[in-house]
Amino acid sequence: MSSGRIVQIIGAVIDVEFPRDGVPSVYNALKVEGAETTLEVQQQLGDGVVRTIAMGSTEGLKRGLNVIDSGAAISVPVGKATLGRIMDVLGNPIDEAGPIGEEERWGIHRDAPSFADQAGGNDLLETGIKVIDLVCPFAKGGKVGLFGGAGVGKTVNMMELIRNIAIEHSGYSVFAGVGERTREGNDFYHEMKDSNVLDKVALVYGQMNEPPGNRLRVALTGLTMAEKFRDEGNDVLLFVDNIYRYTLAGTEVSALLGRMPSAVGYQPTLAEEMGVLQERITSTKEGSITSIQAVYVPADDLTDPSPATTFAHLDATVVLSRDIASLGIYPAVDPLDSTSRQLDPNVIGNEHYETARGVQYVLQRYKELKDIIAILGMDELSESDKQLVSRARKIQRFLSQPFFVAEVFTGSPGKYVSLKDTIAGFSGILKGDYDHLPEQAFYMVGSIEEAVEKAKKL
């Protein structure tokens, strides 16, 4: 164990000088004597000086303080002891319920599974949310991104998915709160507690008031815990809210580490940092990790380097649209922009595929006709186009759905719609079976039977 001393502090970045024969390796964890702070080595600058990122506040630190090299990377508790607990980036409990009592700790920097160990699957994961199951179905062991600007419903959608999947799914889940609001983390904890699934969930939080070092590493902490469950042969769910903040934390420290910024001020290592995280989120022959990640889209611009880099790693992308939210249609998923590699007749079967493509065709055609309607009015359309517009408006409304987690706001009870009912409902609308019903009957209902019942009351 060599020891050194602090020679420079710039915000979250600290330079430490060690004897030349005892320079710590990159990613080693260092402890500051007399303070609770842990540092992680990022660069070796030469002459025995290393540049580190602080995993915690640097207030009260000063030059000359002694620093001890732990000789290993940051390690966190893994295994069953983490279930039902809330931890920080270093694996310390923050729920005031005593020590974790883990039997094993793993380092947070690990290699991705080799190509030979990886396993792919085509099994569908039913979410109970109509628009997602229809247009961008999730794969078991796949990676899903929820893309959306500020305030279009990423976290509410994430909570509903967690409720529907984690409660219906009997396995373990890990939730990593990366740079999000503490209130949301709190809501999530109580949601899990009330649903009696807390004993199957490990929670790791590095919220937005924490230093960038914590936000940069907390995703890896959560992922390490998920990998342990996977390697024990379980099917694990990994929820990350929000991947963008992980990128942003890297941006915050990048300039302080002395790197030249690249496009839009992001770190030059953006693609590599994202790849290191995403390549580890994968399924092996032992078990699977199904991950659902919220991705904040700055200024609603999907071509921003951060969301654009994330796109490449995903199996399904759920794009939330402000235009759809402004119509009062929730979940505000854009059925024309959202995609999934599962949307293939060989995987999901012809009926599902034809229905999904039919819905997209009708909505796309309606989008094209909107300009004509705005200028000339509905009367100028041909009979077939009038019929198509009427069906498109019904489909648009039928894509909305009351959520369980939003019952407190909406006052209407949540609905879980099975894939079979979803396909039956949309294919019925496309065939014209429900042309006689008013379009408001389709708004905020679960299955098509409920729309028929609602129409009787209108």
Swiss-Prot record:
GO terms for cellular component: plasma membrane; proton-transporting ATP synthase complex. ATP binds at G148, G149, A150, G151, V152, G153, K154, T155. Pfam families: ATP-synt_ab (PF00006), ATP-synt_ab_N (PF02874), ATP-synt_VA_C (PF22919). Transmembrane segments: none annotated. Signal peptide: none annotated. Gene3D superfamilies: 2.40.10.170, Bovine Mitochondrial F1-atpase, Atp Synthase Beta Chain, Chain D, domain 3, P-loop containing nucleotide triphosphate hydrolases. Its EC number is 7.1.2.2. It is an enzyme of class 7 (translocase). It is found in: Cell inner membrane. Its main location: membrane. PROSITE patterns: ATPASE_ALPHA_BETA. InterPro entries: AAA+_ATPase, ATP-synt_VA_C, ATP_synth_F1_bsu, ATPase_a/bsu_AS, ATPase_alpha/beta_chains, ATPase_F1/V1/A1_a/bsu_N, ATPase_F1/V1/A1_a/bsu_N_sf, ATPase_F1/V1/A1_a/bsu_nucl-bd. The keyword Ion transport applies. It is a peripheral membrane protein. SUPFAM superfamilies: C-terminal domain of alpha and beta subunits of F1 ATP synthase (SSF47917), N-terminal domain of alpha and beta subunits of F1 ATP synthase (SSF50615), P-loop containing nucleoside triphosphate hydrolases (SSF52540). Keywords: ATP synthesis, ATP-binding, Cell inner membrane, Cell membrane, CF(1), Hydrogen ion transport, Ion transport, Membrane, Nucleotide-binding, Translocase, Transport. SMART domains: AAA. It catalyses: ATP + H2O + 4 H(+)(in) = ADP + phosphate + 5 H(+)(out). F-type ATPases have 2 components, CF(1) - the catalytic core - and CF(0) - the membrane proton channel. CF(1) has five subunits: alpha(3), beta(3), gamma(1), delta(1), epsilon(1). CF(0) has three main subunits: a(1), b(2) and c(9-12). The alpha and beta chains form an alternating ring which encloses part of the gamma chain. CF(1) is attached to CF(0) by a central stalk formed by the gamma and epsilon chains, while a peripheral stalk is formed by the delta and b chains. Belongs to the ATPase alpha/beta chains family. NCBIfam families: atpD. Produces ATP from ADP in the presence of a proton gradient across the membrane. The catalytic sites are hosted primarily by the beta subunits. This is ATP synthase subunit beta. It comes from Pseudomonas putida (strain W619). The lineage of its organism: Bacteria, Pseudomonadati, Pseudomonadota, Gammaproteobacteria, Pseudomonadales.
